[in-house]
Design a protein with these regions (language model features):
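Fold-independent oxyanion-binding glycine-rich loops
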Residues: 13-15, 22-23, 34-40, 75-76, ...
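Conserved anion/nucleotide-ligand pocket segment
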Residues: 18-80
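Rossmann-like dinucleotide-binding domain that binds NAD(P)(H)
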Residues: 66-108
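Single conserved hydrophobic/aromatic residue that forms the stacking wall/gate
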Residues: 1-7, 11-12
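C-terminal substrate-binding/catalytic lobe of Rossmann-fold NAD(P)-dependent dehydrogenases
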Residues: 92-186
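Alpha-helical scaffold segments in soluble metabolic enzymes
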Residues: 18-22, 33, 84-91, 136, ...
Length: 186
């Protein structure tokens, strides 16, 4: 789907669509940082020394999303987030040092875009793939979505946590691949 990014197509992923919506019409040079969020998966609160007890059935129970088996396992290990970091670098033509990721257990904020003036735009929506799909299909217009809207009046909290990279080394794999040349991410 052509969205006027670096290439002629855009990956229809919730995080990348969220970034695109926040950066659309903005000067690319004014972007200081892109932050992609993740729920932390089913093992966010599990100590690393308990990882050996993880079963496939447990790994397939994502706390937010209902997905296929492979992407659910990739999400459980944060490998999916590592792939999204690599994709963001090429989709938005941004240095890897300007891409960050953070755990957001509620799954309502999909990305943050920080600009050089200190402004940060957050893209929020309920976790539902109908939203980025309708965005891609309707671009540049917005299509009314059948997805449940967030009621800000009843929203109690939004929490964010730094990713423990010793527990989830896939994030470091992404940066290693990006910093070692264009072919390395393949």
């Amino acid at each position: 789907i052509s969205l006027g990014l670096v290439g002629s197509e855009m990956c229809i992923r919730d995080r990348h669509c969220a970034v695109h919506q926040s950066t659309r019409g903005k000067d690319q040079g004014s972007i200081s940082k892109i932050t992609l969020t993740c729920s932390g998966g089913p093992f966010y609160n599990l100590p690393k020394n308990k990882f050996k007890e993880i079963t496939i059935q447990r790994a397939l129970k994502h706390p937010i999303w209902q997905m296929g088996k492979k992407i659910t396992i990739d999400s459980s290990t944060l490998m999916n987030k590592a792939l999204e970091i690599i994709e963001a670098k090429y989709l938005f033509n941004i240095d890897s040092e300007k891409i960050d990721t953070i755990i957001h257990p509620e799954g309502l904020v999909h990305s943050f875009v920080e600009f050089s003036d200190g402004t940060i735009l957050a893209s929020m929506a309920n976790p539902d793939m109908k939203i980025p799909i309708s965005y891609g299909l309707g671009f540049p217009k917005s299509i009314s979505s059948v997805s449940k809207k967030i009621d800000l009046q009843t929203l109690k909290k939004l929490t964010f946590h730094k990713i423990n990279r010793r527990k989830f080394p896939s994030i470091d794999f992404a940066y290693f691949a990006l910093n070692h040349g264009r072919g390395m991410p393949i």
